[in-house]
């Protein structure tokens, strides 16, 4: 089977709970990449909509056998969009892999976290990347035979303070974390 991402608009009431990101960068806000034809000047500079991903498992015959709406699994208090990224997608994923136990592991570039998604409960089983363990723009997570996780941390806009606040500094750095 194959897991694909299906884009879906988040319920407007749930959208109000989502924190962080660049104000006005929602779909239909002042984000020209999403909301305006080439060469036209944006006219609507208000807040637009936020979309999510629905992880969808398909058989080789394109039969849907499992779905998980990530916006229902995320916690708006914990899963905050990083300050210098857009608010058009919550979360934005850049990789996903199946673990030996059947659960899924992925990274979110705009939440700067690693997630293990529990396929049975459709909830976040584990997240990494906050506070003193802060990572930034991670990708390519893999579960190892010993149960550990290995991933790549781009280190972009990494926070200078140990509690993971908003003191961002250059230069970017890269590292592999286990």
Model-derived regions: residue spans:
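Histidine-/acidic-rich catalytic cores in large beta-rich domains
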Residues: 1-178
């Amino acid at each position: 089977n194959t897991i694909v991402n299906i884009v879906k608009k988040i319920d407007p009431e749930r959208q109000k709970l989502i924190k962080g990101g660049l104000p006005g960068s929602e779909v239909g806000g002042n984000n020209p990449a999403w909301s305006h034809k080439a060469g036209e000047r944006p006219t609507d500079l208000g807040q637009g909509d936020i979309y999510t991903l629905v992880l969808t498992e398909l058989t080789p015959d394109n039969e849907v056998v499992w779905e998980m709406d990530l916006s229902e699994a995320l916690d708006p208090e914990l899963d905050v969009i990083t300050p210098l990224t857009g608010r058009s997608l919550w979360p934005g994923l850049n990789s996903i892999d199946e673990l030996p136990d059947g659960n899924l592991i992925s990274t979110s570039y705009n939440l700067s976290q690693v997630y293990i998604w529990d396929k049975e409960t459709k909830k976040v089983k584990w997240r990494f990347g906050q506070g003193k363990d802060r990572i930034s723009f991670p990708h390519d997570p893999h579960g190892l035979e010993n149960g550990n996780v290995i991933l790549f941390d781009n280190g972009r806009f990494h926070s200078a303070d140990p509690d993971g606040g908003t003191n961002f500094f250059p230069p970017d750095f890269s590292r592999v974390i286990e």
